[in-house]
Design a protein with these regions (language model features):
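Generic, well-ordered alpha-helical scaffold segments in large soluble proteins
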Residues: 99, 120-127, 149, 153, ...
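Short amphipathic alpha-helical segments with heptad-repeat character
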Residues: 180-187, 191, 224, 228-231, ...
Length: 440
């Protein structure tokens, strides 16, 4: 069967060859048919030449030594992360300063090269902060953008900065520094909201409100007691974040790609310079796990749930049916068609955005669940959910504090609501048990 197939193929090829090798007699319109073909071939050749020229113009990647051709534009656009990980520029420059100083101290670069690198990094940082730095997609990520810009600026000394360092340990070092800074900001916002809630409680000292279970009137409680329940929840939220900060505050630098380096580096020096507690003990663990980000996003999700419950309560209390609070105009919005409306939109959005924070956690959990050791490119996708979670929770905390500072409790309406629903039934039952020995 195989020989028949081969024979058939050979016969077909010979037939085609003889057909196209026969001299053709020009006929009417032949030149008109050939001309478009020539034009197409010229266009294709021009495109190929342009592509080759563009290929030659492309900058060689940091990893491009063994490759004979560049990635396509489509692959370059798909794999870049500079569009979002430029958020890490400050932490990346911090890490590079510490690494350069360590290399110089260990004799792996000269002091003059170190000074050139540090000066160049300072100039790049100023350029970024002034909005003058040009982020390039062809340089893939924040690390290569800064390193290539440094090479453009100071030349050969910049190429020594990557000694004893991989983007694997560099990226997770940057990310740990960023998460540490993010935790500090979130905890500060939590404290601000706690203070706002305490002030609100003090302004309404002695006010009794209906307490609810199952959204049914249950027992009378002090408003202060109710507001301080949220303060306690927020205290635990802050505690979780601080615990997370302590666990993630270890330095991955020196782990390199996954197996460390044979060069005589000083991991303790870089760890101390960056404010870490100590270097991480296992190089594979250092570059491959993102549990420190998962823990942060988990803590954010719990905080978001607490804020969502607060938002739900205040939205209910601002309704005509309850009428317990009146938000100021400065924290309310109206309707485009109903002129009487005054909506507590900020707290509705706090309630809504909690879904987004929880979704960011689920995204990262799903990303990490099937990855073999050690590093995988999938982990490039860990940044955006983390950035979004932190940005969203900061906004939720800030607007909740703003709302707390701009609401009024309608004390007369609350007092009129107290008699309904037999709120003192439990107190009466307790009295009967205590005074007349009735079983209840």
């Amino acid at each position: 069967m195989e020989s028949l197939t081969s024979a058939s193929s050979t016969s077909t090829l010979l037939s085609l060859r003889s057909q196209f090798s026969k001299p053709r007699t020009p006929s009417v319109g032949f030149t008109h048919r050939v001309k478009p073909k020539l034009e197409v071939r010229c266009v294709l050749e021009a495109m190929n030449n342009a592509g080759a020229a563009a290929e030659n113009d492309k900058e060689v990647k940091l990893w491009g030594g063994r490759f004979e051709e560049s990635v396509t534009d489509l692959v370059e656009r798909f794999t870049e992360s500079i569009s979002f990980d430029k958020e890490l520029y400050k932490q990346d420059i911090m890490g590079s300063r510490a690494h350069a100083s360590m290399l110089a101290k260990q004799g792996l670069m000269s002091m003059s090269d170190r000074d050139s690198i540090l000066q160049g990094l300072d100039e790049i940082e100023r350029s970024i902060e002034n909005g003058e730095f040009v982020w390039r997609t062809d340089r893939e990520d924040v690390h290569m953008n800064i390193e290539a810009a440094l090479t453009d600026k100071i030349g050969e000394p910049a190429k020594k900065l990557h000694t004893a360092r991989s983007r694997n340990d560099q990226a997770t070092t940057d990310f740990r520094l960023w998460c540490r800074d993010a935790i500090d900001k979130i905890v500060a916002r939590i404290r601000h909201l706690q203070v706002s809630m305490v002030i609100l409680a003090l302004k309404n000292e002695g006010l009794i409100v209906p307490g609810y279970t199952h959204l049914q009137r249950a027992q009378p409680v002090l408003l202060q007691h109710l507001l301080l329940a949220y303060v306690e929840q927020l205290e635990r939220d802050a505690g979780r974040l601080l615990d997370c900060r302590a666990r993630q505050n270890f330095s991955p630098l020196g782990a390199c790609a996954l197996a460390g380096t044979g060069l005589p580096i000083d991991r303790l020096m870089t760890s101390d310079a960056l404010g870490f507690t100590a270097p991480m003990r296992n190089s594979i663990d250092a570059v491959s796990d993102r549990d420190f980000v998962l823990e942060l996003l988990s803590a954010n999700s719990i905080t978001a749930v607490h804020l969502s419950r607060l938002g739900e309560e205040w939205v209910l209390w601002a309704s005509e049916e309850f009428g317990f609070i009146t938000p100021s105009d400065c924290v309310s919005t109206g309707s485009s068609i109903m002129p009487q409306k005054k909506n507590p939109d900020p707290m509705e959005l706090v309630r809504g955005k909690s879904a987004r924070v929880i979704g960011d956690l689920v995204t990262l959990l799903t990303l990490c669940k099937g990855l073999p050791l050690a590093y995988n490119r999938d982990l490039q996708e860990d940044k955006e959910p983390a950035f979004d979670s932190v940005k969203t929770i900061l906004g939720m905390l800030e607007v909740s504090a703003e709302f707390a500072q701009n609401i009024t409790f309608n004390q007369e309406r609350i007092r009129k609501a107290l008699p309904a629903g037999h709120l003192d039934a439990t107190t009466l039952a307790d009295y009967l048990v205590n005074k007349v020995s009735r079983v209840f």
